[in-house]
A protein has these predicted regions:
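Short, glycine/acidic-rich beta->alpha junctions
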Residues: 37-41, 187, 227-231, 245-250
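Secretory-pathway glycan-assembly enzymes, especially type II membrane glycosyltransferases
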Residues: 1-143
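Catalytic donor nucleotide-activated moiety binding site of glycosyltransferases and closely related
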Residues: 62-63, 148-152, 169-232
């Protein structure tokens, strides 16, 4: 409401892309200042495409998400605006919308629920990448992908996290914070070593915004400082080849969990109230309890490895008891 009461006169370009002309439409507004919120709202598109075929779906979307527009959409209104600027009310966007409304005979406003039922969502319709098929969990070579964020790190101890926050408070994160990024890399490397010792032939991938290096030639390091569609698709392909993805809680886990068979998430204490909100849960039965695991924010590499190994070693019996031997 604050933004509405104090609208911005900043010019914002909006591009209208018409895939299918419709006289009756429902408009799904996905604009938000947080990446995860936009993606979660976009997931609702499948509902309107499938449940309301008599209405053309119009999606209002930040341009950086254009690669995720699913087939079946009538129109896309691409907004050239940084996510961080999507707090307020922009007269330019409102003006564009008002200009388009007379083009239709009927217009409905779609509800963009923040947490739709993930198990019903077909992520391939959004990314074009087929997710890991559970029935091939043990047939495919073991593959684990680590999601390594540099803005939300995995810390070894409470003291390490406290000192990192001190650096941030005094403006030293850019100069001295690299040590903590390298410390996270060491935690990931130690996790890989422990997993490899029990799962011969396991393959590893690392993704995330960051600089490559430090893991050796046996790890497929897909980290980069610049994002584009090719990188997004390469990351999704890595998730879809993975039985397990590992990462710290955050919106960075939405697409990995939508494509991989399962995950291990490092959950900070101050995010307990948001548990599972960043996980695209693919299953509606007990398999979700087995395949989606949450560990302490200061979990050791041994803990990560122990859960990963269990997911492979115990999968056959758990799947048989909870998926096969039931009515």
């Amino acid at each position: 409401m604050d933004g509405y009461q104090a609208p911005s006169d900043q010019e914002v370009k909006v591009e209208r892309i018409i895939h299918r002309a419709c006289e009756r439409v429902v408009i799904l507004n996905t604009l938000d200042f947080l990446y995860g919120h936009v993606l979660l709202k976009l997931y609702n598109a499948q509902h309107y495409i499938d449940k309301h075929p008599d209405l053309g779906l119009v999606i209002v979307l930040p341009r950086m998400f254009q690669w995720l527009v699913p087939q079946g959409v009538a129109e896309v209104w691409l907004v050239d605006q940084r996510l961080g600027e999507a707090h307020g009310w922009y007269a330019a966007i409102d003006r564009f919308v008002q200009q388009q409304l007379p083009n239709y005979k009927e217009v409905y406003v779609g509800r963009g629920y923040a947490h739709p039922e993930f198990a019903d969502i077909d992520i391939e319709r959004f990314t074009g990448v087929r997710p890991f098929p559970m029935e091939e969990f043990l047939q495919r070579p073991p593959h684990v992908t680590f999601v390594a964020r540099q803005d939300r790190l995995w810390f070894a101890t409470p003291a390490a996290k406290f000192l990192y926050r001190v650096l941030n408070k005094f403006g030293l994160k850019k100069s001295l914070g690299r040590w903590y990024v390298h410390a996270q890399d060491r935690l990931i490397r130690r996790s890989m070593d422990r997993i490899s010792a029990r799962l011969p032939g396991v393959r590893f991938t690392v993704v995330g915004l960051g600089d490559k290096g430090g893991f050796g030639t046996d790890v497929d390091d897909l980290r980069t400082q610049r994002m584009d569609k090719a990188t997004e698709l390469a990351w999704c392909a890595a998730y879809a080849q993975s039985q397990v993805v590992v990462g710290v809680h955050g919106s960075n886990m939405l697409l990995p969990t939508a494509h991989a068979a399962g995950c291990i998430e490092v959950l900070p204490y101050d995010r307990y109230g948001n548990i599972v909100q960043d996980v695209s849960v693919r299953y509606s039965d007990r398999m979700q309890l087995f395949l989606y695991r949450f560990v302490d924010e200061f979990a050791s590499p041994s803990t990560i490895a122990r859960h990963t190994i269990s997911m492979f070693k115990d999968f056959a019996v758990y799947h048989r008891d909870n998926r096969e031997n039931i009515f």
